[in-house]
């Protein structure tokens, strides 16, 4: 649904408040009695109370601060990856700091979230709130920034003639092989 069928929205358990699904470019016949649509250029709505207008304006500012009106674009020449932090869903288990990869198989239509572009499928796949193990690489991604934010970081480059030592913050607790002199 593109929010054009109010009865279908409500019949499918639609709830009040910001929606996980976003609208991409196009023309939509949306009932503005039921919905407010916030874009970079304007807010589409029927007249709102002063309080509701302030809430919508604050939300538009918040989305704008997260660059939420534009897709995430990562070019090969940027030498960057996108670190995703999800702001919805169940919390990580105690002691964990990075959420595992879920819903990454296009073969499973029910849970394939296509790199966080379908928030409902991400959550259906068991996705957790917090920083994600799965990163974004070259491509264009239409992600609801109320659902998830993306921090761009430089790719790691190990110069010729040098090495990089890797320390993992995920996985099972391993045996410390560094020796007593390291401590």
Residue ranges and their predicted role:
Residues 1-183:
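Interfacial loop/beta elements and low-complexity acidic/Ser/Thr-rich segments
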């Amino acid at each position: 649904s593109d929010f054009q069928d109010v009865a279908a929205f409500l019949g499918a358990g639609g709830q009040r408040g910001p929606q996980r699904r976003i609208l991409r470019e196009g023309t939509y016949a949306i009932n503005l009695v039921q919905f407010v649509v916030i874009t970079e250029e304007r807010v589409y709505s029927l007249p709102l109370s002063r309080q509701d207008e302030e809430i919508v304006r604050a939300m538009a500012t918040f989305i704008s601060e997260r660059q939420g009106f534009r897709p995430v674009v990562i070019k090969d020449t940027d030498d960057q990856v996108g670190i995703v932090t999800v702001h919805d869903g169940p919390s990580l288990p105690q002691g964990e700091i990075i959420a595992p990869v879920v819903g990454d198989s296009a073969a499973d239509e029910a849970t394939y979230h296509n790199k966080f572009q379908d928030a409902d499928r991400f959550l259906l796949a068991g996705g957790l709130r917090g920083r994600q193990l799965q990163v974004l690489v070259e491509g264009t991604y239409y992600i609801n920034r109320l659902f998830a934010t993306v921090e761009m970081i430089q790719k790691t480059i190990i110069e010729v003639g040098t090495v990089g030592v890797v320390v993992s913050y995920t996985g099972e607790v391993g045996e410390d092989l560094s020796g007593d002199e390291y401590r």
